[in-house]
Swiss-Prot record:
Protein's name in the database: GMP synthase [glutamine-hydrolyzing] subunit A
GO molecular function: ATP binding; GMP synthase activity
Coiled coil ranges: none
Record carries keyword Endoplasmic reticulum: no
EC number: 6.3.5.2
PROSITE patterns hit by this protein: GATASE_TYPE_1
GO-annotated cellular components: cytosol
Pathway membership, UniProt: Purine metabolism; GMP biosynthesis; GMP from XMP (L-Gln route): step 1/1
Keywords: ATP-binding, Glutamine amidotransferase, GMP biosynthesis, Ligase, Nucleotide-binding, Purine biosynthesis
Source organism: Methanococcus maripaludis (strain C6 / ATCC BAA-1332)
Any Pfam family hit: GATase
Active-site residue list: 76, 163, 165
Keyword Nucleotide-binding: yes
Length: 189
């Protein structure tokens, strides 16, 4: 099972639905849920930190990002929280918008396996990661944001600024499936 921490974003139920389409069980929990409560359930194989409107109301997510031994994926605000937890810098975007953008994948990696080096995604850019922590590598960027996706260099911790769970994002299902594979789920190819 994947647990989705609800940071108040409008797409949190869409994340759960996208996982259901992949036949991956998932449940939504409040962002006040602790890592200890999550790992007490032996069925949980991965954590998704959802998007949301307010980074100051989701600080429990930082502890999860720092201490989880199971894979973590941060989406939008979740991505920013992961970066902030490890010492990255998050601030207002230069180009504040909610729109379709082109994502450029730097090189094939485990999160973007089977995804072309250039694809269209739906993204929110009110705030964004400006400086990536040293223990992370940048996986993807766009014309308006230099840090569209990150991965911890040693742990299975990922972040994406864009929304893979919405239909406007090409290959979003592939990206979510790749994360689920890191969590130990298997799929027929």
């Amino acid at each position: 099972m994947i647990v989705i921490l609800n940071n108040g974003g409008q797409y949190v139920h869409r994340i759960q639905r996208s996982l259901k389409y992949l036949e991956v069980p998932a449940k939504i929990v409040p962002n006040s849920t602790t890592l200890e409560e999550i790992i007490a359930d032996s069925e949980i194989k991965g954590i998704i930190l959802s998007g949301g409107p307010d980074i100051t109301k989701a600080t429990n997510c930082e502890n999860i990002a720092l201490n989880s031994e199971i894979p973590v994926l941060g989406i939008c605000l979740g991505h920013q929280l992961i970066s902030k937890a490890y010492g990255g810098h998050v601030s207002r975007a230069d180009s504040e918008e909610y729109a379709s953008i082109t994502i450029y994948v730097k090189e094939e990696n485990d999160l973007f396996k089977g995804v072309p080096s250039k694809f269209t995604a739906w993204a929110s850019h009110m705030d964004e990661v400006k400086v990536t922590p040293g223990c992370f590598e940048i996986l993807a960027y766009s014309d308006i944001c230099g840090v569209e996706s990150i991965k911890h260099k040693e742990k299975s911790i990922y972040g994406v600024q864009f929304h893979p769970e919405v239909s406007h994002t090409e290959y979003g299902d592939v990206i979510l499936k790749n994360f689920c594979k890191k969590c130990g789920f298997e799929f027929e190819e």
